[in-house]
Amino acid sequence: MRLFNWRRQAVLNAMPLVKPDQVRTPWHEFWRRFRRQHMAMTAALFVILLIVVAIFARWIAPYDAENYFDYDNLNNGPSLQHWFGVDSLGRDIFSRVLVGAQISLAAGVFAVFIGAAIGTLLGLLAGYYEGWWDRLIMRICDVLFAFPGILLAIAVVAVLGSGIANVIIAVAIFSIPAFARLVRGNTLVLKQQTFIESARSIGASDMTILLRHILPGTVSSIVVFFTMRIGTSIISAASLSFLGLGAQPPTPEWGAMLNEARADMVIAPHVAVFPALAIFLTVLAFNLLGDGLRDALDPKIKG
């Protein structure tokens, strides 16, 4: 016994001491990969700044975005008083772009959230149960995919009526099949894994398997696609507002601002440039952030 204890102590002494801060969790691995991607980090900072601006836009904006009118400077370009210039009604474009960030970002995020929630549920059911569940859900997705996204959104808004709330519903509807197919594919792969068979063998219910084992395995893919889909949704919402089907004047939504700027683009191009630039930078940032998240969450990528 004494010899055994001596040998055990010798083995323990030979083992390197691992400090708590040296233990690498999945979060540490993700952060290590993500922070090496400079474009993704820049995009993440931009998105964080955009979210802060959107939350506090009403307080940050130097002028009232809807009820301030400077009739002495109609269509004037950028100046110290009005950083982005003034539109044809005398409204401060900088203030309207800031408040527009709140509306456009909320429309994009809520639309994708609704589409992701419904699409994830349908994808889990189709991939796990297969059979008629799978055939029914996938045929519905095929029908929705047969229409161009913006055309489907226009049709939905035409039925429901104009307004930002209906735009969110319309954009969410054509986001559903994309998430459903993504989650279905992941579910079909995960349900064949041995840990799923083990869960079944101990009597785990289908609900437990779906929520505790399969859904967590699809989260990384959902997060990446969710992030990139926000940019698409912002463009779609802005397009509908540009066509007069979304936010209505004087609401300072970016697409609606572009619609109002059409008549003055030749004599006052700044009226359209700044809302368009806001859309471009926001969509680019979300796409770059999504690319960075995908690379950081991909277990095959080594630092």
From Swiss-Prot:
<dbReference type="Pfam" id="PF12911">
    <property type="entry name" value="OppC_N"/>
</dbReference>
<keyword id="KW-0813">Transport</keyword>
<protein>
    <recommendedName>
        <fullName>Glutathione transport system permease protein GsiD</fullName>
    </recommendedName>
</protein>
<comment type="similarity">
    <text>Belongs to the binding-protein-dependent transport system permease family.</text>
</comment>
<feature type="transmembrane region" description="Helical">
    <location>
        <begin position="40"/>
        <end position="60"/>
    </location>
</feature>
<keyword id="KW-0812">Transmembrane</keyword>
<dbReference type="InterPro" id="IPR000515">
    <property type="entry name" value="MetI-like"/>
</dbReference>
<dbReference type="GO" id="GO:0071916">
    <property type="term" value="F:dipeptide transmembrane transporter activity"/>
</dbReference>
<dbReference type="Pfam" id="PF00528">
    <property type="entry name" value="BPD_transp_1"/>
</dbReference>
<feature type="domain" description="ABC transmembrane type-1">
    <location>
        <begin position="101"/>
        <end position="290"/>
    </location>
</feature>
<keyword id="KW-1003">Cell membrane</keyword>
<feature type="transmembrane region" description="Helical">
    <location>
        <begin position="266"/>
        <end position="286"/>
    </location>
</feature>
<dbReference type="InterPro" id="IPR025966">
    <property type="entry name" value="OppC_N"/>
</dbReference>
<keyword id="KW-1133">Transmembrane helix</keyword>
<feature type="transmembrane region" description="Helical">
    <location>
        <begin position="144"/>
        <end position="164"/>
    </location>
</feature>
<dbReference type="InterPro" id="IPR035906">
    <property type="entry name" value="MetI-like_sf"/>
</dbReference>
<feature type="transmembrane region" description="Helical">
    <location>
        <begin position="222"/>
        <end position="242"/>
    </location>
</feature>
<feature type="transmembrane region" description="Helical">
    <location>
        <begin position="165"/>
        <end position="185"/>
    </location>
</feature>
<dbReference type="InterPro" id="IPR050366">
    <property type="entry name" value="BP-dependent_transpt_permease"/>
</dbReference>
<comment type="function">
    <text>Part of the ABC transporter complex GsiABCD involved in glutathione import. Probably responsible for the translocation of the substrate across the membrane.</text>
</comment>
<keyword id="KW-0472">Membrane</keyword>
<dbReference type="GO" id="GO:0005886">
    <property type="term" value="C:plasma membrane"/>
</dbReference>
<comment type="subunit">
    <text>The complex is composed of two ATP-binding proteins (GsiA), two transmembrane proteins (GsiC and GsiD) and a solute-binding protein (GsiB).</text>
</comment>
<feature type="transmembrane region" description="Helical">
    <location>
        <begin position="105"/>
        <end position="125"/>
    </location>
</feature>
<keyword id="KW-0997">Cell inner membrane</keyword>
